[in-house]
Amino acid sequence: MVLHYTPHQSAPRNTTFVAEILDLDYQGRGVAKVQGKTWFIENALPQEKVEVRIVDEKRHYGHGISCKILTPHPDRQSAKCAYYAQCGGCQSQHIPIDMQRQAKQQALFQRLQQLQPQATFMPMIVAAPWHYRRRVRLSVRFHPKSKQLAMGLRQRNTQQIVNLQHCDVLEIPLSQLLPKLHLLFSTWSLPKNLGHVELVHADNGIAMLLRHTGNLAQTDRTLLTNFAQQENLMLFVQDDQQITQLHGEAPYYILRDGTKLQFDIRDFIQVNAVVNQKMIDTALEWLELTSNDNVLDLFCGMGNFTLPISRQVNQVVGIEGVGEMVEKAKRNAEQNQCDNVQFYQANLDQPFVQQHWASQHFNKILLDPPRTGAAFALHALCELGAEKILYVSCNPATLVRDTAILLQFNYRLKKVAMIDMFPNTGHLESISLFEKE
């Protein structure tokens, strides 16, 4: 979750204060109460006494960073990554992984239990806390005065770039590629034209996209192509107009059931492959799919849930707002010989009950909306009268809001599980099953 803070209009009298930390929120921030005001403090754990530097302050709450740990928690740990103090990629490496997960789970479950006390809270869906990211976007910036080039992630709370030679949350092949990229760009003829690099570890190798401004010099194109051949990369370049593939094939990943999902370098895919598979398995299990089911998959993308569902049901219809993704989903269905699947483009923030696909009978529905949630679609969705709705969420705030809406339409929250898709960060995802009463 990205939080945009607006500084308080009047500067505080003191820029630091001492606080005792009472709790931990799901984003890994310590929570303190000082003179009736709630403070959310980075790099602080429960039971600690810390000196806090104020980042911003509102009337009823404020944000700060602990600049000195006066009384440390006995379980506080040293960060695994040497860049952790500066890099904005992770927020929670000082917190033991069990404590991270407990805080995330408690925050989600407390909110939902207030709405549906009878809901069953299932074990968390987890995987390894390190080397799990199969995708990363790296900023690249050349400093003309120093003649130095930086490549990495943004520094915490600034726009500066942390120059990364490795990353402990990236899958190992991606992390191992970082120093080689630094070496490549050190010989670049026009480094000021470099924009960013995207890396994706697909099941058929690493795909790389280089974003640049202006024309790519022939010497740089040759360097880049030779590098891609040497490292066996699928290579793409993007200028101000288009993306061009210079080497390799299209990237894809394969699910446990053999479903092969091909995607383009800029397409959204779940960054944690292991957790993605567990999430799919959980969705299929909770929906209790049978060969008689007709399933509707909303916000379906290129078919990450749709195609595995199709192997167990009578028919599945996938709805996606982006036309290009619909075409890719159709292509994936054809390549996987899934002939009981239909995909349609629809803007789900507009009424859709009159669209022809909505006139079909669906007894089960899956939706995986963006961070803004699905409040705009839930009224029409509930009118379809499905017996089960499975909701995959990447934002606890919109999940709680949408749960309240579903309860108003006589759906009951039966069970929910937290998904630790991004260990050592403040991100929280979940999967929830609703049943018609």
UniProtKB/Swiss-Prot annotation:
Instruction: Quote the EC number.
Output: 2.1.1.190
What residues form the catalytic site here?
Answer: C394
Pfam families, per the entry: TRAM, tRNA_U5-meth_tr
Enzyme kind, highest EC tier: transferase
Q: Please give the CDD domains that the UniProt record associates with this protein.
A: AdoMet_MTases
Q: Name one GO biological process term.
A: rRNA base methylation
Catalysed reaction(s) here are: uridine(1939) in 23S rRNA + S-adenosyl-L-methionine = 5-methyluridine(1939) in 23S rRNA + S-adenosyl-L-homocysteine + H(+)
Per its UniProt record, what PROSITE patterns does this chain match? SAM_MT_RNA_M5U, TRAM, TRMA_1
Specify which residues bind S-adenosyl-L-methionine according to the UniProt entry for this protein. Answer: Q270, F299, N304, E320, N347, D368
What the entry lists under InterPro entries is as follows: 23S_rRNA_MeTrfase_RlmD (IPR001566), MeTrfase_TrmA_AS (IPR030390), NA-bd_OB-fold (IPR012340), SAM-dependent_MTases_sf (IPR029063), TRAM_dom (IPR002792), U5_MeTrfase_fam (IPR010280)
On whether Glycoprotein is a keyword of this UniProt record, the answer is no
Q: Name one GO molecular function term.
A: 4 iron, 4 sulfur cluster binding
Q: List residues binding [4Fe-4S] cluster.
A: C81, C87, C90, C167
Q: What does this protein do?
A: Catalyzes the formation of 5-methyl-uridine at position 1939 (m5U1939) in 23S rRNA.
The entry sums up its family as follows: Belongs to the class I-like SAM-binding methyltransferase superfamily. RNA M5U methyltransferase family. RlmD subfamily.
Q: What is this protein called?
A: 23S rRNA (uracil(1939)-C(5))-methyltransferase RlmD
Q: Which gene encodes it?
A: rlmD
